[in-house]
């Protein structure tokens, strides 16, 4: 699932990266030559081996073409809202890599040069924040905002962001009118009857049909392997012989696929908050695993709220805080707050807390105000802003890309009985997110284009050590995913932040992690063994 952001309040997604912004459709809750084939030599992906060979040849052609063309850098358009001296441009790629001379699309990229001397420069560091559906164009702003965490790395690298295919300024796709997408209140994601389930199934089917009607030409090509090929073309357009890459959340899966397809094109790769790359997890089982992890992190937040009852007055035990949540949820189900905030919108707002420690105090404060009688604070935080047409279009686009990539990347159960069985079972013990997540992904059950077989992620010849960073109690990308990728990428190193659960670790202040990320990016060096770091500072009320 993705983080929901119908509400217009700042979240950590723009900086730490994540499964990034969106809203559930019904539950709201958000250079070197290209390698010839996958590292295992078999067609584990788009059909069969011949298809992979055609796409690999197409990627090589596109990369060579981009290397010759380069990028025409210029000041960014005013509506991109990127401060100078950040520069913007486009890279042209095939829509279908099996047809490299066929229809082309343009990918938006931006950059800021390294802050150190020419002799200190090591190349470009390309970033993906996650999603699928997240824009990386804010990455160079870490330099203009003088982020202390990234100051050392910025001396050595140009910071480069991009909008992946289908996102933002890169041939954007859409599945529904944005203003319709954000209307509230949406149906309660927890079904109270079989009729409720039928209604949600109808919405999911109509959403999938809308994706095909509005963006059908792009849908078959909205896959992680194609985005990885795009990434290699961007590398070539930048004039980089090898890729330096930072990927967070879904960006870790993009990195894993890139490292499998182009192992000898990787120079440095940091993956933070890792999607489990196992083929039997992508993507149906991965979302079920999230439901369990979100419940655990939700309880962590409730424990923290209870420990700070003097500040929030929501109860001094987890059970009391949960009781307040259930009362709020029931009240919103009976009569939506302000006419627009029902249970779906509440989940959209409150899920920030399981995602990020930085949201713990703000979420608790607004919850506390509601219990004390200030309903408006919660309405302002959780309700959509229909006047924000640009933001709503971005949210709808992000959700469309999320759905398109996850539904096309892999095969999903087409039988409703499977979904009903699995989510009914999970909801009993993990009620916070289960049904909301299910409805968000249900369009994949009736997806109108061919669903692929995920790549077998593994080490290929030439892949250097990859640095993996993960918090132990991450809800969006459970810890087991980092362990799985660590096992698949030989020579990789795993840094674990114990007793912590924020999603997106490299952007937090934790010297045990920050110093090792700097060392790796600046020298390629890693510890002789995996490292466990103490958690970053606990939030304060």
Swiss-Prot record:
EC number: 3.4.14.-
Pfam families: Abhydrolase_4
Positions annotated as propeptide: 37-39
GO biological process: proteolysis
Entry annotation: catalytic residues: 249, 474, 503
Main location: secreted
Range of residues in the leader sequence: 1-36
GO function term, MF aspect, one: tripeptide aminopeptidase activity
Domain AB hydrolase-1, first and last residues per copy: 123-501
Keyword Protease: yes
Localization per Swiss-Prot or TrEMBL: Secreted
InterPro entries registered for this protein in UniProt: AB_hydrolase_fold, Pept_S33_TAP-like_C, Serine_prot/Carboxylest_S33
One GO cellular component, as annotated: extracellular region
Keywords for the protein's UniProt record, in alphabetical order: Aminopeptidase, Hydrolase, Protease, Secreted, Signal
SUPFAM superfamilies in the record: alpha/beta-Hydrolases
Keyword Protease: yes
Entry function: Cleaves tripeptides from the N-termini of proteins. Does not cleave mono- or dipeptides, or N-terminally blocked peptides.
Family of this protein: Belongs to the peptidase S33 family.
Protein name: Tripeptidyl aminopeptidase
Gene source species: Streptomyces coelicolor (strain ATCC BAA-471 / A3(2) / M145)
